[in-house]
Curated annotation (Swiss-Prot):
Binds to the 23S rRNA. GO terms for cellular component: ribonucleoprotein complex; ribosome. The gene is rplI. It comes from Pelodictyon phaeoclathratiforme (strain DSM 5477 / BU-1). Belongs to the bacterial ribosomal protein bL9 family. GO terms for molecular function: rRNA binding; structural constituent of ribosome. Coiled coil: none annotated. This is Large ribosomal subunit protein bL9.
Length: 151
């Protein structure tokens, strides 16, 4: 029997794939558990239209991500942190601080998608990588300044 997988099944394949399985496995396990549906003409057509819509949606999201990437590349962020007279920070600048600075500029990126190569413990100019889509990573340029120097 041919079925369309609704979820990823380790032994069979990924969601959306059409696979051939034994009748008993499909009728007694996959279909009742909601892991698959029967592959009929109607469901196959529905699957194709859903895949086309999904592809269009992903392309639109990728286009918006590229636009965001260009905006972020040109941006110059300022991150404020407590610092001593010598320019050494009390603590470190984290990805959460960079995410907050981006949010203040109107760009919302999850802090877990921002990576800093080395701990930032002094004032100065730095770069971080931000993954804004599946395959689009952008360099975020920012400057760490002492908290009292805000204008």
């Amino acid at each position: 029997m041919k079925v369309i997988l609704r979820n990823n099944v380790a032994t069979l394949g990924d969601a959306g794939e059409v696979v051939a399985v034994k009748n008993g496995y499909a009728n007694n396990f996959l279909i009742p558990q909601g892991m698959a549906i029967r592959a009929t003409e109607g469901t196959l057509k529905a699957l194709e239209t859903e895949k086309k819509q999904q592809t269009k949606k992903i392309e639109l999201q990728r286009k918006h991500a590229r636009e965001h990437a260009q905006t972020i590349e040109q941006m110059s962020l300022k991150v404020y942190a407590k610092a001593g007279d010598s320019g050494k920070l009390f603590g470190t600048v984290t990805s959460a601080d960079i995410a907050d600075a981006l949010k203040a500029q109107g760009i919302d990126i999850d802090r877990r998608k921002i990576t800093i190569e080395a701990p930032i413990k002094s004032l100065g100019k730095y770069e971080a990588d931000a993954k804004i889509f599946q395959d689009i990573t952008v360099k975020v340029h920012f400057e760490v300044e002492a908290e009292g120097s805000e204008a």
